[in-house]
Amino acid sequence: RVNITSAMHHGHKFEPLSILIYENLYNTKIGEYGCIENDDYPHLAASPDGINIKLDNPRYGRALEIKNPTTREICGIPKKEYWVQMQMQMECLNLDDCDFLETAFKEYKTEDEFLKDGNFNTTKDGKRKGIILCLNDGTKPTYEYVPLTITTYTQYEIWRNETIDFNPHLTWITDTYWYLETISCVLVRRNKLWFNAIKHKFKEVW
């Protein structure tokens, strides 16, 4: 049984939404690559949240690291351990840039509260909002994200019905009505001097 209210699951639920918003915001496309080993240090490996793969986009070839904090305040400055994580990722991927994306999502308590706040996809104060469908295959939850291009409740109802009909093996569990409270995207550059200064320690450990 999966605890869908834990902080870890919060990240699992909202990370794909963060990617959708990032792609929409920067007109790009994110590809997933799984775990990638460092060519020179096979014991080093990285699993980036994604890499920009849209060829004609200025961000092409840039890695993406996502955090969805639930309590920590977003300040635009990566914590030391996150910075180190991104440096290791860039070394394994042999990339020079990484976008550090932080998104803080809040949830409405009811559908009525969601509908009364602004229009379908924007709050009264101009923040993004939307809906996530939670479905279950009998063992674990899966999520379907209302496309950011949907702007009316009527469009949403059509999409929802089509989505549920397309997944007859899944059972609807609940809906999440969200809004994006805070978003920060900071460019982190690869620091070869730092890596070269500490890489000797890898031999001491391995």
Locations of the language-model features?
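Accessory terminal regions of nucleic-acid processing enzymes
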Residues: 1-206
